[in-house]
Amino acid sequence: MSAVAPDGRKMLRLEVRNSQTPIERKPEWIKTRAKMGPEYKQLQQLVKGEGLHTVCQEAGCPNIFECWEDREATFLIGGDQCTRRCDFCQIDTGKPQALDRDEPRRVGESVVTMDLNYATITGVARDDLEDGGAWLYAETVRQIHTLTAEREAGATKVELLIPDFNAEPEQLAEVFSSRPEVLAHNVETVPRIFKRIRPGFRYERSLEVITRAREAGLITKSNLILGMGETREEVSEALQDLYDAGCELITITQYLRPSVRHHPVERWVKPHEFVELKDEADAIGYSGVMSGPLVRSSYRAGRLFQQAMEARGVAAAGSAQAAQAV
């Protein structure tokens, strides 16, 4: 077994240990069928013809057909090297390139070209930057809102999936000031195994980020990945923790191992458990829940946003105002 990662660097001890376990065979329910509707086909041709880049196609997301049919897509900002390492994430850890200050404009132009209804922006942790990359995240939201302001179908909604910025008040304030429609920060796993799976993050700090976003008036969202060593009871506790912290939207998914260097799959969660977890999250009080083996944090993101708006009474208030104006 080679002790060298694909990018040529020496593998970490954890990666060497992980690589002793072969890639697991997926159960029969971990599969999807391609349903290529007209909107998907149009976007596929557009992305290819314009040389655009989205996480959707580059990561081989199984939900691309559904999301693109809704004119939703996800973009990665900040480069392809993260300053932190999570044991489930396919983005590599290393020294990032210099900050590309034109990236927000280019992402905004891509959103315009694709005529998206909803864009999810995610990115790498940039602890090498003085502001942790806060300006980059915020400016990308601002560019999308500005460039799509005159869009016939309405300005593109933006979901911003952020690292924790070490919960630094100034950095979070910069990000929150851009007013994304949804502010997402993914906790991903439960407290007992959190440090092992996400050594660069802290569970309580992640909850704090969600709380601060909610206090800033933003719709909040998080994600839990199952199959990395958690127990069923711990998942229930994490769902309650997130809700108590102010989380309104939640996605729950099965861990799929990116390579032998990553954490082995410890269990395959059966479909009925995902249904049970959705019912449980609904009962706790979440405004919107997506739970399933192939759900990803940006899956049906626009629909979850609408559910959160309805739960807040925004849609009802808007209808009442329209009726009064007639």
Curated annotation (Swiss-Prot):
Keyword Iron-sulfur applies: yes
InterPro entries hit by this protein: Aldolase_TIM (IPR013785), Elp3/MiaA/NifB-like_rSAM (IPR006638), LIAS_N (IPR031691), Lipoyl_synth (IPR003698), rSAM (IPR007197)
Cofactor binding summary note: Binds 2 [4Fe-4S] clusters per subunit. One cluster is coordinated with 3 cysteines and an exchangeable S-adenosyl-L-methionine.
Residues that hold [4Fe-4S] cluster 1 according to the record: C56, C61, C67, S298
Subcellular localization: Cytoplasm
Keywords: 4Fe-4S, Cytoplasm, Iron, Iron-sulfur, Metal-binding, S-adenosyl-L-methionine, Transferase
Catalytic reaction list: [[Fe-S] cluster scaffold protein carrying a second [4Fe-4S](2+) cluster] + N(6)-octanoyl-L-lysyl-[protein] + 2 oxidized [2Fe-2S]-[ferredoxin] + 2 S-adenosyl-L-methionine + 4 H(+) = [[Fe-S] cluster scaffold protein] + N(6)-[(R)-dihydrolipoyl]-L-lysyl-[protein] + 4 Fe(3+) + 2 hydrogen sulfide + 2 5'-deoxyadenosine + 2 L-methionine + 2 reduced [2Fe-2S]-[ferredoxin]
One annotated GO molecular function: metal ion binding
Assigned GO CC terms: cytoplasm
Top EC class, one word: transferase
Domain of life, source organism: Bacteria
SMART domains, per database record: Elp3 (SM00729)
EC number annotated for this UniProt entry: 2.8.1.8
Cofactor(s) annotated in UniProt: [4Fe-4S] cluster
Binding site for [4Fe-4S] cluster 2: C82, C86, C89
Domain Radical SAM core, chain residue ranges per copy: 68-287
Pfam families, per the entry: LIAS_N, Radical_SAM
Pathway recorded for this protein: Protein modification; protein lipoylation via endogenous pathway; protein N(6)-(lipoyl)lysine from octanoyl-[acyl-carrier-protein]: step 2/2
Keyword S-adenosyl-L-methionine in annotation: yes
Family membership: Belongs to the radical SAM superfamily. Lipoyl synthase family.
NCBIfam families tied to this protein: lipA, PRK05481.1, PRK12928.1
Name this protein carries in UniProt: Lipoyl synthase
Taxonomic lineage: Bacteria, Bacillati, Actinomycetota, Actinomycetes, Kitasatosporales
